[in-house]
Regions:
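Generic ordered-secondary-structure signal
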Residues: 11, 15, 33, 41-47, ...
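Short secondary-structure junctions
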Residues: 24-36, 95-106
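Sequence-level detector for tyrosine residue identity
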Residues: 10, 39, 56, 91-92
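Short, extreme N-terminal segment that most often corresponds to the first beta-strand
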Residues: 1-30
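Long protein-protein interaction modules used by eukaryotic assembly/scaffold proteins
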Residues: 67-69, 75, 79-106
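Short, surface-exposed beta-strand/loop "edge" segments at domain boundaries and coil↔beta transitions
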Residues: 12-19, 55-56, 76-87
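A structural detector for beta-sheet-dominated domains
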Residues: 9-11, 49, 60, 72-74, ...
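Short, intrinsically disordered low-complexity segments
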Residues: 31-72
């Protein structure tokens, strides 16, 4: 299973803005995240990318601490050995001044 999870704070507390920032950092285009109108996770703000190679990226906003977010890779195929891509994603977002990294799951 491919996985990655990065917990961070974003002072502006806007899931769409942080989605555009992360989309630009990872994909060089600001509009890869979508889906806020369809909450997939127990009525918490959640945006996601299209499925690519059996995975998608998701950003979830904590409903209690609205400046707290989680960026994760969701493997929809869930086959094979564990592959952790946390370090690779951190490489692209760690120097972004708008993001304060909180916790990295590995």
């Amino acid at each position: 299973m491919i996985r990655a999870e990065i917990i961070f704070r974003y002072a502006e507390k806007d899931i769409l803005k942080i989605g555009r920032i992360i989309s630009t950092l990872l994909f060089k285009t600001p509009n890869m995240f979508k889906g806020l109108e369809k909450y997939l996770r127990d009525e918490v703000p959640f945006i996601f990318t299209d499925n690519f190679l059996g995975c998608y990226l998701g950003i979830m906003q904590n409903p209690d601490e609205i400046d707290l977010f989680c960026l994760e890779i969701v493997d929809v195929l869930s086959k094979g050995s564990d592959i952790d891509l946390t370090e690779r994603i951190l490489y692209y977002i760690k120097d972004c001044p708008e993001i304060e990294l909180i916790k990295v799951e590995q």
